[in-house]
């Protein structure tokens, strides 16, 4: 946090809101006035009530107000009390507040005779942070399950410490009139809470109760109302018990839920949702229930119980569990929830609706996104009825509008700390604060830094908006494979700048010419140039277009997140990315330079992918390409023993490789994982991206420390030759060695490759990024080996190493160049 003391002439540069309604009086000679603006995530967290109570305790007069820049405070009294007030603003803030900076100045007193909360004002640039949705707090939970409380079993209970924020806010500043709660008029009791400084609902914008707030309804798949209020929830619970699929309108969108113990129900959900084998997440009624099925660490428990309440990827229990000395009976979860997967994505109820439903059921449920595969989740009940009626048997809906969707976030613990895999509910749109990781010449404090819109990648898309030193990263959008997904992407690209009244100076996009996000970047710039409506043509400049290489964006994201300076060696391993030479990169070592540029200092030996992108779903194609690169025409002899393909398919792929037709070159480590999984018989065809690589990771035998051989070919850039590794691997296959041993030796070899290249380059800072580093063992092994060699190693925590982090990296890399 930064504290800036301004001068009386310009106290922090902020313009005051209009004067409060408090009367003025004669000013004691020893009184001074303290003027403050607090920036950060300080709206929607009870910050103004906190300031009010603190001022009352210290008997200070003045006012506090939300502005589009943050929280504005004027307070006056004795200097020693003002200094105490200033210290306690910094140290005693509400639990969910994030204070980024405080600007303050001492002025002559004006004569306020009371302290009040003023109406919010729109003034200056919009720099206040929008808070994510927050999981239900313990105080609200007590009320929800207290039969004597007026909010007993009320599924929309909230206070200043919890409830919806990002999913309901329409504009800044954060006030009820700027949220989707604006049409719900508070009853007398709620109004009294809202205006009581001693109540935790003091200025809680979504405040509501059964008398005046939103309500539930249950619908048939034909849209007929079945029941209302609490009866609607019981209808949904009974449907789940009966093995039916329920579409539930949650905090940031719809979820599809079924009994996680009912194999037939889970299979039916897969069939209707067109989701063959990709794992489902499971919501448990309690932490004790999760412990019955899973081995969870202390950190994983904290994540599950946190205000963010993400899905946490944990290991399934290997033996019978005991809790408090008593044997715990595990739930018999359906096999098809996560087939052939030793891990399970688990979460706890995070909204009042989930808490009441899970109390009613008291068993785990599958809770997956309310959409068809590759489409965005539904947010409107009428749209959901159209899109999900072929999946759901019953709909549990409500009348609180969802302004923007936010899917469940996903994290896992790697190297003793959390790693984001999907950043959405609970985290978005909080910004990532970035400094200057490269020694780019300063533009000077008086020159405004460019505002950058980064539009991300094609898969696992998110977008980012850079304003000064903050980068606001959107919620997870997903793969841009359907028109519905692309429409959601376009809405987010418009929504994020609109919230902050941002005029875009630079649009950053990927270099891949066929990505929809890249085309959007070009169209955005072209449209801005051709129609600068409403702009002063003498001042306005069209936005620049910055195309950022895919893997360089990965490196920039990880450097920015860890706030490290160049030079640094980026190890970027993933499935695919458009390279500077027009080939498919994915096994890269990029040296970040002090001038904001990079050099490709090493990469994996290339091989061809017959059929191009089809290899993502058919690992056997990667295997054939690998064998052909290594053995030429003799590859077909090896393929008879290792690759499961029909003779017709083999003949077709052979022609592609020999004639180099639709068989692009790649250096991808992701495709190398796929090839190895195919060669050892684990997976010939995949139903979702990364499936073969995941199964190769899961197959690893824990106690094996041996590694396959490899060769480093000197040159510029250096080339990592996997040929010796594949020859040894095929020999192991011929000896009927177990897949567990082969997988372990393969993983260990990859970690050694990183160490050898890093030592040859001679760079102390090593950055691990790209989707391959979602692999827990690979990351932990690489980190351990690099540390053994006294190298400093960095990896992701707040931002996903996969393509969900690309937008952040694009914004950072573009800022270094502009």
Question: What positions do the PLM features span?
Answer:
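A contiguous, well-structured pocket-lining segment that forms one wall/lid of small-molecule binding clefts
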Residues: 213-215, 457-487, 491-495, 625-765, ...
